[in-house]
């Protein structure tokens, strides 16, 4: 969900990224169960999508349309992963995108851990909070790595397709 929220924020704007992240959490919890954690999940994934939009607006992430000429000339087909792009600045932007994917797993974990510490650590002490956060760290790292891998594979093809739909139907999201 984090990668999808980041891609939505980068292609459709920060507000759309927030909505995709928040509504993805709400919709998934209809299947997996709503609970007191649901608003925290909605906020965390919404925040990740929003930050994805902010960073894309600042030019930190690769612009999928920048490789259009490269794609038209027959190199690296339309669905080639982001890592196969040419250009030093685009590679640097791809590295920043992957780094944000890694950090987004930790950011999501921080928000959810705040809920967990406030809701479950009794008595609320600093050692108890540290133990709670330390226990969740492996899951947060796996979440970040998975988000980075999904961004590496899906960012370019999805942004190209979303940009095509936005152009075709004259969608105004920003």
Show the residue positions of the predicted features:
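Interfacial aromatic-anchored transmembrane helix boundaries in multi-pass membrane proteins
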Residues: 22-58
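Low-complexity, intrinsically disordered segments with a bias for serine/threonine
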Residues: 69-71, 83
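Intrinsic-disorder-associated, low-complexity terminal segments enriched in Asp/Asn/His/Tyr and depleted
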Residues: 70, 76-78
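Hydrophobic transmembrane alpha-helices
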Residues: 1-11, 15, 19
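Membrane-embedded alpha-helical hairpins and interfacial helices in multi-pass inner-membrane proteins
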Residues: 35-39, 54, 58-63, 81-174
């Amino acid at each position: 969900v984090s990668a999808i929220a980041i891609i939505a924020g980068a292609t459709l704007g920060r507000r759309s990224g927030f909505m995709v992240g928040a509504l993805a959490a709400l919709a998934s919890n209809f299947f997996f169960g709503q609970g007191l954690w649901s608003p925290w999940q909605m906020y965390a994934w919404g925040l990740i999508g929003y930050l994805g939009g902010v960073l894309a607006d600042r030019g930190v992430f690769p612009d999928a349309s920048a490789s259009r000429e490269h794609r038209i000339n027959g190199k690296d087909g339309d669905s080639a992963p982001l890592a196969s792009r040419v250009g030093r600045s685009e590679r640097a932007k791809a590295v920043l995108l992957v780094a944000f994917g890694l950090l987004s797993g930790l950011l999501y974990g921080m928000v959810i851990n705040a809920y967990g510490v406030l809701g479950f650590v009794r008595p609320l002490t600093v050692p108890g909070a540290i133990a709670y956060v330390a226990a969740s760290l492996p899951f947060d790292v796996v979440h970040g790595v998975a988000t980075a891998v999904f961004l590496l594979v899906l960012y370019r093809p999805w942004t190209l397709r979303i940009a095509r739909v936005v152009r075709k139907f004259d969608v105004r999201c920003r």
